Amino acid sequence: MFNLFKQTKVAPRVVAGDEVVELPFFDDTLLLQTFVLHSMFVFDQALDVLKLQDALERLGQRAGWRKLAARLRRNAAGQLEFHIPTEFSSQRPAIAQTHIHHETPLSQHPVSAFLPKPSAQPAIVGNAEDLRPLYEGLNCPTKLDDYLYEDRSVVGLHVVSFHDATVLTLNWIHAAFDATAKKAILDAWNLVMLGREDQIPTPVSYREDALKDLGTNPLSPHALADRKTSTLGMIRWALSNVTDLFFRSQETRIICVPAGFVENLHAVAMKELVSFPPGPGEERPFVSEGDILTAWVARLAVSHLSQYPDRTVAIQNAFSARKVLRQYLPADQPYIANCAFFFNVLVPVKDVLGRPLSYTAWQIRRAIKQQTTAEQTEAYCALLRSSGQSKLPPFFGDSSMHMLSFSNWTKIDFFGLDFSAAALKGAGPVRPKYIQNVQTPYKFTEMFPIVGKDEQGNYWLSGTRTTQNWDIIEQALREESPMTGST
């Protein structure tokens, strides 16, 4: 009886003339529907806010790019749909935008004290949530309902401007697109500001599901099919991790890893790999800086598990499958949707902690070569299709595993973004000095996005885990050798 007077939410009326489009199969998943992403870029120059806003609005109204202006609705069957305006006005713009202006330098704002700065040694340099006053504007979306019950575009822009700095935050529902698509949007936005709209590519059409056949006819089983965790196994895993998943507070902290540190780790690893004989049909062992950085973070993350040497560490890594799916996605057209899947590495704790970093990095590189082909992507997506209505990704390992999730955006090069076209004064490139990403309303525990390398070559990454587990990383970092990364 306590809900008798509770107000029922009502979705905005359907606007006649809006183009109604079904969500693509791989976008319409439980996980992607749940999360709103907030991607913040800090520039140490004053930018023309009106130019920024106008350019993004024009992009959202542009033919082929109007998905950015889409509104989310449920149809009579309860399925999500994009309702894409065909006409725009000041009352119904393409892009939801907010702006806060401060008549001071950034250094005089209280939150500036929390802005992470590069470090001489690998270190935790900040907490992402401390910057909430910068990345969340008035009426900022934080959950799916904020899109369903308001006439809000799936993409939003929040700008905080100072005399000497500008903070831009793109927010969007993850069901709209992934990190690779975000970079395509940033590049197109920049071309509008540069007056080079004729160079903006036309995206793959949002009117049809370009990946509708992906995973429907795999030619081979997945490489880890025999290690796929059953539904019962995942229930057992969830129950054994219920405290961390649902009761302990999760924190998203920022880690800076100096350029020289990663370069040294990589050089040592390449020397060590000479002693690793390649497998049948394999080339001479090689690892990238990304491989060794992922291995290094994984070792930090499980440094407290030495008493469980045989426990499986499941390292799942997101990758964009666009390049290997050319039968579905043309190379000259950006795909403004989700096309990121996972490759997986399963190694025991004793190997992650007891063997050289190069060993774990090599396992990651082998998994990339083995599991990110077109054939294996088809097999992975076939498993995803078989997971039921929620379309949860397949998990590999066992019910007692420690799962770590990574996503490396270094090749996307967000730090290479040049917004000099919007600079109010000065010449030369205007690149972000700091970038972070936050997800709401929930946080995935043990998730580590690698944002990329700044102009000085420093790697920036964030991690979401419990406060207790961050204490473990703090301790492990204090014990790190400054040259080799060994403990």
Swiss-Prot record:
Its EC number is 2.3.1.-. Keywords: Acyltransferase, Transferase. The keyword Transferase applies. It comes from the Eukaryota. Coiled coil: none annotated. Gene3D superfamilies: Chloramphenicol acetyltransferase-like domain. Disruption phenotype: Impairs the production of neosartorin and accumulates deacetylneosartorin and novofumigatin A. GO terms for molecular function: acyltransferase activity. Pathway: Secondary metabolite biosynthesis; terpenoid biosynthesis. InterPro entries: CAT-like_dom_sf, Sec_Metabolite_Acyltrans. Belongs to the plant acyltransferase family. Acetyltransferase; part of the gene cluster that mediates the biosynthesis of the tetrahydroxanthone dimer neosartorin, which exhibits antibacterial activity. The two different monomeric units appear to be synthesized by the same set of enzymes, among which the Baeyer-Villiger monooxygenase nsrF is the key enzyme for the divergence of the biosynthetic routes. The pathway begins with the synthesis of atrochrysone thioester by the polyketide synthase nsrB. The atrochrysone carboxyl ACP thioesterase nsrC then breaks the thioester bond and releases the atrochrysone carboxylic acid from AacuL. Monomer. This is Acetyltransferase nsrL. The gene is nsrL.
